[in-house]
């Protein structure tokens, strides 16, 4: 299938449904990301293949025209039927994302649905095929700060120990035992034998040492967790000793995170190949798909699923007809699929940029924005899956905040706001776009000139765009299972907004407060300290918590063994299928 051809047809269809359509060569060059010379050459090639008739405009001001031999709907259905027969998923997803009428797909919607979700191949391999609604960012543990990517790392790797969310304690994993000195400065770990990496070598203490050393790099997301390490010694092949410069009872909790995935010391890290010890290993990764295969040599129970496929599909309303195991978009009516909702998954918030000069530096302006956004009204009037209104990082601590819109004009006057433009950053996620537009409209009612800057997840976490080009940002935070660790990471992680947008004066005071939190041994007192830190952040309007959203996943009723992963998704390594899956498919895919 020629994707450029259908990109052009969809673009022109939205201008005219006629078979003969006027156009500008510059427009086609733009959508094809090429020069006008190459766009003209491409049209001539299509004409040579009898796909269209190209009628260039002769003379200045005369518009060029294209004549197509058949309607776009007919061509789309022909290609779809061929792609379905060939299991050409990439082509099908491409067509589903085009800005063309959803009704065109109605006659073959069942066939399209059955290509996703549960499958069994000709040689009886069980496959789970799913969709993600954006391109993946980095899978390097040194940088990963996004929940979906952290979840994927937990499926292809293992940490030294794990955190049991139900029991609220650390449990053995690669390390079967450990001991710690009374002052929490000396840690000794005893490793399992016969833990194999994906390339066949047995893991030993030198690999753990290598991983910790790698994670101690200054630009690592985990640097703040490991900066107290004084020495790492391999006592023998399966025993490791770590000495800290100062006491840190949280040290072992740091080792549970996806960022502490144990890597082999003898392989240069490549996030597109990813060698570790996890229950799955990467078979293929590119912009279109990520394919995981079960690792037969896994040191615990081998996954029952043989393969998991994540296909990237960023746009397209027709995609709502497909089972979406890994997205918050609802899956439309199919009785075989059951929607699972989880309340209060993380928190959505605004974070103000205190590096940039301008009106957002004024506390009165930030307070005006606080009173402007009444999330209780949003949850009732505007948005699905909005969840509960937030006033704290934790859902269980949040109570409906008091908003006083009658104060806004006086606060704007106090801040000497003169209608100047304020850059409001948000991501490309559909719900974020809708919510940010709602906030922009609320602001306009009070004369606040908010200009939205829409950025990618990659830019939000791994670039200087938030700090250099926005006055405040709206983001969502999905924490790990360990509540206290999640809060520490939210405020310490160099790739998350607080560390990106707070100036050094705020960071210094915040660090002192977090250090006091970490050194407090009593959990109930730490809870009081967390409330105090959150109150300090919100009363100064450095942060404005918005809401704790719902998370929904559409799962086939035959999927069993569902267990929550620390990052809000279900653990693929524990999934199994109760009866015969939907249909037989080929052993491979395109």
Where on the chain are the PLM-derived regions?
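Aromatic- and charge-enriched surface segment that lines or borders ligand/interaction sites
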Residues: 17-21, 42, 145-147, 177-220
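Periplasmic binding protein-like
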Residues: 447-492
């Amino acid at each position: 299938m020629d994707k450029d051809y259908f990109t052009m047809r969809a673009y022109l269809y939205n201008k005219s449904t006629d078979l003969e359509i006027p156009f500008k060569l510059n427009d086609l060059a733009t959508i094809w990301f090429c020069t006008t010379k190459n766009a003209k050459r491409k049209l001539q090639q299509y004409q040579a293949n009898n796909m269209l008739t190209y009628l260039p405009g002769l003379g200045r001001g005369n518009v060029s025209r294209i004549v197509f031999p058949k309607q776009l709907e007919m061509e789309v259905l022909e290609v779809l039927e061929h792609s379905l027969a060939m299991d050409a998923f990439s082509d099908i997803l491409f067509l589903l994302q085009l800005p063309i009428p959803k009704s065109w797909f109605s006659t073959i919607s069942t066939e399209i649905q059955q290509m996703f979700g549960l499958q069994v191949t000709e040689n009886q391999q069980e496959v789970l095929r799913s969709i993600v609604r954006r391109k993946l960012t980095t899978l390097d543990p040194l940088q990963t700060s996004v929940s979906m990517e952290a979840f994927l790392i937990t499926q292809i790797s293992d940490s030294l120990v794990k955190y049991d969310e139900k029991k609220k304690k650390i449990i053995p994993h690669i390390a079967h035992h450990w001991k710690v000195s009374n002052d929490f400065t000396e840690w000794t770990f005893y490793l399992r034998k016969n833990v194999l990496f994906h390339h066949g070598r047995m893991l030993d203490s030198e690999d753990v040492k290598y991983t910790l050393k790698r994670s101690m790099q200054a630009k690592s997301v985990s640097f703040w967790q490991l900066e107290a390490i004084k020495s790492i010694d391999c006592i023998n092949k399966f025993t490791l000793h770590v000495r800290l410069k100062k006491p840190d009872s949280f040290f072992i909790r740091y080792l549970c995170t996806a960022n502490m995935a144990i890597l082999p010391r003898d392989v240069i890290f490549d996030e597109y190949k990813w060698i570790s010890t996890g229950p799955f290993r990467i078979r293929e990764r590119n912009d279109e798909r990520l394919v995981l295969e079960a690792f037969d040599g896994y040191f615990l129970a081998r996954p029952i699923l043989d393969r998991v496929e994540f296909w990237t599909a960023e746009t397209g309303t027709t995609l709502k007809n497909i089972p979406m195991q890994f997205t918050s978009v609802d899956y439309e009516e199919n009785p075989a699929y059951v929607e699972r909702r989880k309340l209060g998954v993380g928190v959505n918030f605004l974070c103000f940029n205190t590096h940039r000069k301008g009106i957002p530096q004024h506390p009165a302006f930030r307070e005006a924005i606080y009173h402007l956004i009444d999330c209780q009204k949003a949850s009732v009037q505007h948005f699905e899956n909005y969840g509960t209104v937030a006033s704290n990082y934790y859902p269980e601590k949040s109570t409906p905040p008091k908003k006083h819109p009658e104060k806004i004009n006086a606060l704007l006057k106090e801040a000497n706001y003169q209608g100047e433009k304020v850059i409001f950053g948000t991501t490309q996620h559909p719900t974020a776009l809708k919510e940010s537009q709602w906030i922009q409209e609320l602001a306009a009612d009070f004369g606040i000139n908010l200009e939205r800057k829409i950025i990618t997840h990659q830019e939000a976490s791994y670039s200087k765009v938030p700090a250099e080009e926005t006055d405040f940002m709206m983001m969502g935070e999905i924490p790990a299972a360990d509540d206290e660790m999640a809060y520490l990471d939210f405020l310490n992680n160099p790739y998350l907004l607080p560390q990106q947008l707070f100036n050094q004066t705020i960071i210094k005071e915040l660090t002192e407060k977090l250090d006091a939190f970490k050194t407090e041994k009593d959990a109930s007192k730490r809870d009081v300290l967390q409330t105090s830190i959150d109150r300090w952040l919100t009363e100064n309007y450095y942060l404005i918590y918005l809401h704790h959203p719902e998370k929904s996943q559409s799962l086939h009723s035959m999927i069993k063994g569902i267990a929550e992963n620390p990052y809000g998704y279900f653990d693929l390594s524990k999934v199994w299928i109760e009866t015969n899956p939907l249909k037989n498919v080929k052993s491979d895919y395109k």
